[in-house]
């Protein structure tokens, strides 16, 4: 279904007389699918090396469904879905995903009791609660293969000899009498005209109208897809239940979920005053400098005044947005009371929190170790949030089998790790970080079995790491064995057909999965349709959606007793979007947009949290912290919550300012008081509706049209320019994706539990269980990750992550702010997320180069803040303008760093003499700088050493990476030269003797040339001036000190760079000192020969003395 044209898809949906077709096929070694009849299928297992597929042609309908819903979901979760451009979407049923055994009932490949068919040793599938899946009402136990055979032959159940029917005996009809309905019931006119106003509205052509939710529906909403209760569930009972839920909420004293805490006036008032004072002093100083040129060295004066004017402008752009810093706090107890507490209308305490989809992206398992990614996934699966509301998606842009099987191993290990974390309240929930803690693990632990459980889980984790580390060799050995078998088969066939035995056998070197079938993604030996840039779309539900009710473990199932612990796991999906030559894949932004579409169809969480593969959840309550802002009064106009980035593995001195606390604790906190922090690429919780490119709601305007504040709104209410004909142009032709948009919008609203909440949803709206997955839904999600789906749509232009820049994160956040949304900065007491950062000098410079290049691209694009709309606040506009301009400071910074050396070489200075006026201005500017630094340290919480490290790195990166970024950006604009970057290598967390080994590795790069030249020239200039001074008959030391001071100031900023060049202490190559000394002596002798000392007369005239006088 997913590969058919969109219009065909709609027509098929309306054909209620057709059932789902299951098509068997054999995949040959060449990659073709050959249809098989029943007579050609041998039950001896000869197909073990080929694909056994069923092709989804027609979705099941309420009138003709081949098996029970939960049974179908189980079969779907055990299938690897593939598809894409000009290919049919296929579901490959897998006997096993990994070589090791699978025990958790939610995981693909989980087996139940034995099959009841004669001469069959297969196992029955398990549902999410560990019970056997039986497709027929007679409860006849049948395995997957026998069920497929029965379906293909007669369609009859082998037990009762009846046709497979709708029904799952384990399912109970949901009871909505408690009032837990998402929206008020439709009006009587709608219920009375079922023929004219059908739930499945059709357009004039008789096709399914995929815009019904966007423009005409006043239906109810559930978690995931839309849920319409039965007609008899509407009426007085429902109304009373709804009113009861509202009354219960209204009776409780209203408390806010978050608070805005202003900076104390004793700190912020002097800070603002100093900014004004320094601005005034700077203006007077620059005026004085312009009016008092140095006639003896006009070229030196002109260069210095141009640089100083730019520095003043740059300082204004950086400092003015810091006028309004704020702090925020959250109240998790209030969140729990509002959304998770039992009540008369919710006796089981089912959560009313909205769902959230967590995205993790990876691209190359060689540079991003699978163990690091697996630990990130485990921290997500163990997050403290309602299990049924969490869905995790991994985007593998490389399509590597190594990543696939590593994620399957992580899902298997989560069966033990996640319940262990819940049972003993473990923090952090990244196993590698937890077992690496240098503190007493028994601190604050009171359960008597903790030590025993920890010992067991540590052993299991060690075995898990060994399995992950052994995956490359395991895959290689497996593939070699299967390829050798295929070569022998091909050779045998060639001999039987009479071919020339001397000719080499041409069999592709395929990569094979654990169940003995070809991997549809990238092969180790890349071939056509199996390389990083050319492979089919792949989607595997590693962990199917959990049940709505807790699944309590027991002491017999696991190595650890979980008899009082919920053992459910969140849904986990592996996604590798389709890539084909000739299609622009748009790097990480394209991968994120593919996840947005796939997740909208599978889970449709109204909020999305994206993480890099090396950033894990350090605070298991981080999601709840973010929800306190989204669900609070006024939270409906928040587009995203940005969490600060914190890093591990940084050297104690933070030589290269990796922690970047000045930015994360200073600039971002200040922007939070304006319109919100910028999006920095990871650790961000998005509102899905904002990602779709819509404007924020205007409650006053919307309430003029709506009678009820909790009534469903149409998309045209948010975007008047969006009509029916523009919907496919903006979002594509996916019907399910279009239907999910207003559902996500509604579920993302705050509770309407306060009169001030003008735009909310009723309490209890999100307690409805989610719909199970079916083949049609998963096939549609494969369709939307195809390479052609975004053609002629607004994905990447207005919708989703924005394309066109290597820093797509900043542009995406800018677009949201430009539409009027605001963002919030969430700093928690315990770090929410932690990740790794490059501590090697060269890697750090390349990282900054990528960021700066993206800023230059922004400056030369339509995303320049100068062109922003009126919805972007003035201070926010200055902040975004600074984002695009700051790399250009490098042009003036490099020149200014050479000025002290030019002064010492020429004997002149930027001013004629060190007059009282110059010194007073210099002193006042310095005092203001120190005062601003001290006060900024006070309100931001950073340290003075961190502030100084940031200043040092600003000069180092400004004279290297930023300069190269400007050159690359200009070349791209003028000559159209595209910019490409290699993926930053992540640390694999190996147990090295020195965890800071990368810090001492010297990797040569052209980015090092400018700082080296600056340092050498200033050192030589000091040496030359020193030698010239001592050769004078009457040495003028004051002149030397005055000129050398500014050179030493430059060298002090370059000190971390010099340490990075020296590598490990005591291992500096001798040749470096030899050449440095020779160069210095040569230049000194050359300068002495060109400008020799002429004796006392020359000294009296000040020849070679530095060119300026102390007053």
UniProtKB/Swiss-Prot annotation:
Region (Disordered): 1-26, 175-202
Protein name: Cellulose synthase-like protein D4
Matching InterPro entries: Cellulose_synth (IPR005150), Nucleotide-diphossugar_trans (IPR029044), Znf_RING/FYVE/PHD (IPR013083)
Record localization: Golgi apparatus membrane
Similarity comment: family membership: Belongs to the glycosyltransferase 2 family. Plant cellulose synthase-like D subfamily.
GO MF term set: cellulose synthase (UDP-forming) activity
Entry keyword annotation includes Glycosyltransferase: yes
Gene: CSLD4
Organism encoding this protein: Arabidopsis thaliana (Mouse-ear cress)
């Amino acid at each position: 279904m997913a590969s058919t044209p969109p219009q065909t898809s709609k027509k098929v949906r309306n054909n209620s007389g057709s059932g789902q077709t299951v098509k068997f096929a054999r995949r040959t070694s060449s990659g073709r699918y050959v249809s098989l009849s029943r007579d050609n299928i041998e039950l001896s297992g000869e197909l073990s090396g080929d694909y056994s597929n069923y092709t989804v042609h027609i979705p099941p309908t309420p009138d003709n469904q081949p098996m029970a819903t939960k049974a179908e979901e189980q079969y779907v979760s055990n299938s690897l879905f593939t598809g894409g451009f000009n290919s049919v979407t296929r579901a490959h049923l897998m006997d096993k995903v990994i070589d090791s055994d699978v025990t958790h009932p939610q995981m693909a490949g989980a087996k139940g009791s034995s099959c009841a068919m004669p001469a069959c040793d297969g196992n029955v599938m398990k549902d999410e609660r560990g019970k056997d899946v039986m497709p027929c009402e007679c409860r006849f136990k049948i395995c997957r293969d026998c069920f497929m055979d029965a379906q293909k032959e007669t369609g009859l159940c082998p037990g009762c000899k009846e046709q497979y029917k709708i029904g799952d005996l384990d399912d109970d009809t949901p009871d909505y009498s408690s009032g837990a309905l998402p929206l008020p019931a439709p009006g009587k006119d709608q219920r009375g005209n079922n023929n004219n106003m059908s739930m499945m509205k059709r357009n004039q052509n008789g096709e399914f109208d995929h815009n019904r939710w966007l423009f005409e529906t006043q239906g109810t909403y559930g978690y995931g897809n839309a849920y319409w209760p039965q007609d008899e569930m509407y009426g007085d009972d429902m109304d009373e239940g709804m009113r009861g839920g509202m009354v219960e909420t209204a009776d409780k004293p209203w408390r806010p979920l978050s608070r805005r805490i202003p900076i104390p006036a004793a700190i912020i008032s002097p800070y603002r005053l100093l900014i004004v004072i320094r601005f005034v002093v700077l203006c007077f100083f620059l005026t004085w400098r312009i009016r008092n040129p140095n006639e003896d060295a006009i070229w030196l004066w002109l260069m210095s005044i141009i640089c100083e004017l730019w520095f003043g402008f740059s300082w204004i752009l950086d400092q003015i947005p810091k006028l309004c810093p704020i702090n925020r706090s959250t109240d998790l107890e209030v969140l729990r009371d509002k959304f998770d507490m039992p009540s008369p209308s919710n006796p089981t305490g089912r959560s009313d929190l909205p769902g959230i989809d967590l995205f993790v992206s990876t691209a190359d398992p060689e540079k991003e170790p699978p163990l690091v990614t697996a630990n990130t996934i485990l921290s997500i699966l163990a997050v403290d949030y309602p299990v049924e509301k969490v869905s995790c998606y991994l985007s593998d842009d490389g399509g590597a089998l190594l990543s696939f099987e590593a994620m399957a191993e992580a899902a298997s290990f989560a069966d033990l790790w996640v319940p262990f974390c819940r049972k003993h309240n473990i923090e952090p929930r990244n196993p590698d970080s937890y077992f690496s803690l240098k503190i007493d693990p028994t601190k604050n632990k009171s359960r008597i079995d903790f030590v025993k459980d920890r010992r067991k889980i540590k052993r299991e984790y060690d075995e898990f790491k060994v399995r992950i580390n052994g995956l490359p060799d395991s895959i290689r050995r497996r593939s070699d064995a299967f390829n050798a078998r295929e070569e022998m088969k091909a050779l045998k066939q060639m001999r039987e057909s009479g071919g020339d035995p001397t000719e080499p056998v041409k069999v592709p070197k395929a990569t094979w999965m654990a169940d003995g079938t070809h991997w549809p993604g990238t092969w180790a030996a890349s071939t056509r349709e199996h390389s990083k840039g050319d492979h089919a779309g792949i989607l595997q539900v590693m962990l199917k959606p959990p049940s709505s009710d807790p699944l309590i473990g027991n002491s017999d199932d696991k190595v650890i007793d979980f008899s009082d612990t919920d053992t459910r796991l969140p849904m986990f999906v592996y996604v590798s979007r389709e890539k084909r030559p000739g299609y622009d894949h748009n790097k990480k932004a394209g991968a994120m947009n593919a996840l947005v579409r796939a997740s909208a169809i599978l889970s449709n969480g109204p909020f999305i949290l994206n993480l890099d593969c090396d950033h894990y959840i350090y605070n298991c309550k981080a999601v709840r912290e973010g929800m306190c802002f989204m669900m609070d009064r006024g939270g409906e106009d928040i587009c995203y919550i940005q969490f600060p980035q914190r890093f591990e593995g940084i050297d104690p001195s933070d030589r290269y300012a990796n922690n970047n606390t000045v930015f994360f604790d200073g600039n971002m906190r200040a922007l939070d008081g304006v319109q919100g922090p910028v999006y920095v690429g990871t650790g961000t919780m998005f509102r899905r509706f904002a990602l779709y490119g819509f404007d924020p709601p205007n409650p006053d305007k919307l309430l003029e049209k709506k009678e009820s504040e909790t009534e469903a709104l149409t998309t045209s209410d948010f975007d008047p320019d969006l009509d029916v004909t523009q919907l496919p142009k903006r979002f594509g032709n996916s019907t399910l994706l279009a239907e999910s948009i207003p559902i996500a919008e509604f579920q993302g609203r705050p509770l309407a539990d306060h009169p001030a909440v003008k735009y909310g949803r009723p309490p209890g709206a999100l307690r409805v269980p989610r719909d199970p997955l079916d083949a049609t839904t998963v096939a549609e999600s494969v369709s939307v990750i195809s390479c052609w789906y975004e053609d002629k749509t607004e994905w990447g232009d207005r919708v989703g992550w924005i394309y066109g820049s290597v820093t797509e994160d900043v542009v995406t956040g800018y677009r949201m702010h430009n539409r009027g949304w605001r963002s919030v900065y969430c700093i928690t007491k315990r770090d929410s997320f932690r990740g790794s950062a490059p501590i090697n000098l060269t890697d750090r410079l390349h990282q900054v180069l990528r960021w700066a290049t993206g800023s230059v691209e922004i400056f030369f694009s339509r995303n320049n803040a100068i062109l922003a709309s009126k919805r972007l606040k003035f201070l926010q506009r200055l902040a975004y303008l600074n984002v695009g301009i700051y790399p250009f400071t490098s042009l003036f910074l490099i020149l200014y760093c050479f000025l002290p050396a030019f002064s010492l070489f020429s004997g002149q200075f930027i001013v004629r003499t060190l007059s009282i006026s110059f010194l007073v201005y210099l002193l006042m500017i310095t005092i203001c700088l120190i005062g601003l630094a001290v006060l900024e340290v006070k309100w931001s919480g950073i340290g003075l050493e961190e502030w100084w490290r940031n200043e040092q790195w600003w000069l180092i990166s400004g004279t290297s990476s930023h300069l190269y970024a400007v050159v690359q950006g200009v070349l791209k604009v003028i000559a159209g030269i595209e910019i490409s970057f290699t993926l930053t290598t992540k640390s694999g967390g190996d147990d090295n003797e020195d965890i800071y080994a990368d810090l001492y590795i010297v990797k040569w790069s052209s980015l090092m040339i400018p700082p080296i030249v600056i340092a050498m020239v200033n050192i030589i200039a000091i040496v030359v001036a020193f030698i010239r001074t001592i050769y004078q008959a009457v040495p003028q030391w004051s002149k030397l000190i005055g000129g050398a001071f500014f050179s030493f100031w430059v060298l002090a900023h370059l000190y971390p760079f010099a340490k990075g060049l020296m590598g490990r202490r005591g291992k500096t190559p001798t040749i470096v000192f030899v050449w440095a000394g020779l160069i210095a002596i040569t230049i000194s002798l050359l300068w002495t020969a060109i400008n020799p000392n002429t004796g006392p007369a020359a000294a009296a005239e000040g020849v070679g003395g530095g060119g300026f006088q102390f007053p």
